[in-house]
Design a protein with these regions (language model features):
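Short, glycine/polar-rich helix-capping loops at beta-to-alpha or helix-loop-helix junctions
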Residues: 80-86
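A short, hydrophobic beta-strand element within the central beta-sheet of small alpha/beta folds
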Residues: 70-80
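C-terminal output helix
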Residues: 100-106
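Alpha4-beta5-alpha5 "output face"
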Residues: 65, 86-90
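Conserved acidic segment of CheY-like receiver
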Residues: 1-17, 25-26, 46-47
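Conserved phosphotransfer microenvironments
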Residues: 33, 42-64
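Short hydrophobic/Thr-rich beta-strand motif most characteristic of the beta2 strand and flanking loop
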Residues: 22-32
Length: 107
């Protein structure tokens, strides 16, 4: 089982990869992530980095909740507030983590 990471910022993606360990794959675009998930059914988590806009991240989480309910989506944000948490909860996001709290990621 692996974790798929989506972050448009290569440096941030590498930081996420380091925090999560060896069983990760970094994908540079939302389309690349979707293609990867279509062919890798064993992925158990997707981490969406802070450089991905919130609407796209929540759309992905909503789609995964319906099509792959066993896969958790972890949302990384530069700042987390009640609005982000409420939107993430409605979309089916498993965890919301502030970028500065990367040890809090339990993907």
């Amino acid at each position: 089982m692996m974790t798929a990471i989506l972050d448009y910022d290569p440096s941030a993606a590498e930081t996420l990869r380091s925090a999560l360990g060896a069983d990760t794959v970094v994908l540079p675009t939302l389309d690349a992530l979707r293609r990867h998930l279509d062919t890798h059914l064993g992925e158990d988590a997707g981490v969406v980095g802070a450089s991905v806009d919130l609407e796209s991240a929540l759309d992905l989480a909503s789609a995964m909740r319906l099509t792959r309910p066993s896969m958790g989506v972890v949302l990384v944000r530069r700042r987390v507030d009640t609005s982000v948490l409420a939107d993430a909860l409605r979309a089916g996001v498993r965890e919301v983590v502030e970028e500065r709290d990367l040890p809090g990621i339990n993907a």
